[in-house]
Curated annotation (Swiss-Prot):
Domain of life: Bacteria
Protein known as: Heat-inducible transcription repressor HrcA
Assigned keywords, A-Z: Repressor, Stress response, Transcription, Transcription regulation
Annotated organism of origin: Lactobacillus delbrueckii subsp. bulgaricus (strain ATCC BAA-365 / Lb-18)
A biological process term (GO) from this entry: negative regulation of DNA-templated transcription
Cited PANTHER family: HEAT-INDUCIBLE TRANSCRIPTION REPRESSOR HRCA (PTHR34824:SF1)
Matching NCBIfam families: hrcA
Function: Negative regulator of class I heat shock genes (grpE-dnaK-dnaJ and groELS operons). Prevents heat-shock induction of these operons.
Repressor recorded as keyword: yes
Amino acid sequence: MLTKRQELILKTIIQDFTKTHEPVGSKTVMNQLSIKVSSATIRNEMAVLEEHGLIEKTHSSSGRVPSTEGYRYYLDNLVQPLQLPEEMYNQIGYQFDQPFNQVDEIVKEAARILSDLTDYTAFAEGPEDKNVSITGFRIVPLAPRQVMAILVISDGSVKNQLYTLPRHISGDEVEQAARLINDQLVGKNLSEINKQTFEQLYSSQIVGKNAPEFLELLESVIKDAASEQMYVDGQLNLLNNIENSDLKAIKSLYELINSSSLAGELIDLSDSPSHYPVHVRLGAELENDLLKDFSLVMAEYSVGRYGRGTIALLGPRHMPYSEMIGLMEYFRQELARKLLDYYGRFK
């Protein structure tokens, strides 16, 4: 356990390093401390911090830099969220103050705003709502043998996919299939639609016999509607935060964050303490060597009965944590407010 003075010195080292990205010496610490301590005493205390593995020496300087353990101690015990500058509050409000037609548009915009504000890579996952249901299914002709399948969800979102009709299927048969699908699926929660539902439709003489490919299309549209949407923005910002120029590593990292399933696993908060609104995982804790020099700042937002979602920032390990935690605490509330405003239109 550290003394109060040792904690203050560790906090000073981390805050200075996240600003300058340069090793921190005892004189720098002495000039920034809020208490009067001699340089010799600070050197002794820094030696204790080094023995605990909380700071480490670099080869190129006599100063010290925080270790992963040092950052973790700071995040668990010392960090305090900073209030955002007034202009940043205004910027967030201004960029959210526009008409949105779907939940996905709001979530996608959230990722873009976060990335623009921080110059980091931002993730935004839409709220997972187990209670949304199908309110309509339509087939719209576009060309002689091309139609669009449109699925309307109770939260106001719309999913669609193009479908090319096989030559043996007539327009009347497609309309019959659409009517049957409406009868079977409209009003059902997405969470209730499963493999058995589609097996029943496949066994139908109208749908399964004449348009099995059409059912595959429908199944694809429904799976897309039921899955939480993940949006990533600022991928190229990774290049500013990669400490080596290994092209293979850069490519692998880019592929990692652009994979919805892998990104979803990355920002999964299921094993994080629920009493913290914002969580930070350091590179060594992310269980992926590609991310060892990064940190992930995550926050969950809630839109009541409409579900919960997650936002996250992927940036360098030496990011200014107080500022980023303060930003995420505020942003998650603003995103939830915007989504609740949207859902309120469908009451």
